[in-house]
Amino acid sequence: MIYYGTMFDHKVRFSIVRMREVVEEARNRHSLSYLATVVLGRALIGAALVTPWLAEKERWTLDIEGNGPIRRVVAQSTSEFTVRGYVANPKVELPLNEKGKFDVAGAIGQGVLRVVRDLGLKTPFVSQLPLVSGEIAEDLAYYFAVSEQIPSAFSIGVLVDSGGVKIAGGFAVQIIDRTLEQEKVELIERNIKNLPYITELFQKAEPLDVLERIFGEKVGFVETAEIRYKCDCNREKAKNALLVLDKKELEDMRKEGKGEVVCKWCNTKYVFSEEELEELLKFKVDNSGS
């Protein structure tokens, strides 16, 4: 569940989310290792936190590429409060870092963060920045500060063990009106700095309690929505993906008796029979003029 709203005469906006089930679904769909679960989980939470601020029908993509062993993590969210994502190396594992935590920064390494905002226009808006930490929360705050000139704080965490995902969630606070009194800015900064790790916080406190600790007072009107893992892949799109292949690749599949397309976002497998591949080959030939 995501909670979102504004504070201090709408000069500050916030979102806070708990989404253990969503991250657990991602872990199961992609058969993720512990570390890969934490990396993708953090990215999905980051993408979920911005959903209340998206335009209608907007698709927002966080794409992190680094020289670490996980290589790439991608998370996408929509204005309908859905998320989906994947990592390039779902089996990655590393020793715990010096703080005894999962080494997310080590898994990602040095690299770049891209944010793609697709508003349904001809060309999506793309921003690219160097990673500042590889921990994802700090990188998101840096992106908003530099690319969108919005001072932001993000805190994101995932706790996983042999039984699966135990806790997954985070919060984002953004100053959207620079006329906010300096004492309020300092209050928010101080309160956030004094908070424990989000995974520890969510073991003891509910989201509204966390917001009260951040702002130093009870929040007023809060909206809520359910975050869902949802992919828009289907058999027709999988068929179109096969049509992109050259004729020889399709013929090789047909000779093997079947063809498979696996969705990178949700790991759904679409299997096409020999007869279906024959039809695709015929369609390809008929439409190529050869």
Swiss-Prot record:
A molecular function (GO) term: unfolded protein binding
Subcellular location: Cytoplasm
One matching Pfam family: HSP33
GO process annotations (BP): protein refolding
Alphabetic keyword roster: Chaperone, Cytoplasm, Disulfide bond, Redox-active center, Zinc
Keyword Phosphoprotein part of the UniProt annotation: no
Main location: cytoplasm
CC terms in the record's Gene Ontology section: cytoplasm
Record-linked InterPro entries: Heat_shock_Hsp33, Heat_shock_Hsp33_C, Heat_shock_Hsp33_N
Annotated disulfide bonds: C231-C233, C263-C266
Post-translational modification: Under oxidizing conditions two disulfide bonds are formed involving the reactive cysteines. Under reducing conditions zinc is bound to the reactive cysteines and the protein is inactive.
Database matches in NCBIfam families: PRK00114.1 (NF001033)
Family the UniProt entry places it in: Belongs to the HSP33 family.
Protein function: Redox regulated molecular chaperone. Protects both thermally unfolding and oxidatively damaged proteins from irreversible aggregation. Plays an important role in the bacterial defense system toward oxidative stress.
HAMAP family documented for this protein: HslO
PANTHER family: 33 KDA CHAPERONIN
Protein name: 33 kDa chaperonin
